């Protein structure tokens, strides 16, 4: 997504956990597009890091126009008893608590026309039984975005969420059993998983002037799985 925004003329701040080589590659692509990338290493599950990310964006780039909440953590578990307490907490801290702290820190800097986007999931409506904590956070993100759209509308700030279906990201092979990875996305009407490049344009639209009347929406990018 950072690359897609850069290609449309945006400078970007990217928070990443530990993937130094991946972050450097994103920075290279952003700079190839003629824009600036500021990388911040840290854990968004830490509220202070969330505040530091926003402060860095304001200090280094002069302000914030778009806030994309895209960090996620998940693990596949086949029974409730198998979910460790700390894993439940980490899932909520990374997926929804971080969004709260990022939004709270960012809103005072957002001007009319700014955009907040949250990454929900098809799991918000069709929760997988083996991804219970993750699915719960994705439903929370969708509802939080819907609340913020109403809360911030008078300030001219638009808020939307995106509900991806199966998309190939590093999260998939690192958190799913091999037999599920092999068939990932094959049960969608389109018969395959999506690529990040097929998802990113939706985020660009929601942040652009072309999406100036889109707020309070949840956009499904699911390969044909309906969200009604």
Predicted regions and their residues:
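Canonical Rossmann dinucleotide-binding motif of NAD(H)/NADP(H)-dependent dehydrogenases/reductases
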Residues: 1-13
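The beta1-alpha1 cofactor-binding region of Rossmann-like NAD(H)/NADP(H)-dependent oxidoreductases
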Residues: 20, 41-54, 85, 197-198
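Short C-terminal tail/terminal secondary-structure segment
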Residues: 77, 126, 186, 190, ...
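Substrate-binding pocket helix/loop in short-chain dehydrogenase/reductase
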Residues: 78-80, 84-92, 180, 184
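Active-site helix of classical SDR
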Residues: 103, 137, 145
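Residue(s) in the substrate-gating loop at a strand-loop-helix junction
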Residues: 121
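Short, small/polar-rich loop/turn modules that mediate ligand/substrate recognition or access, typified
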Residues: 153, 158, 214-216
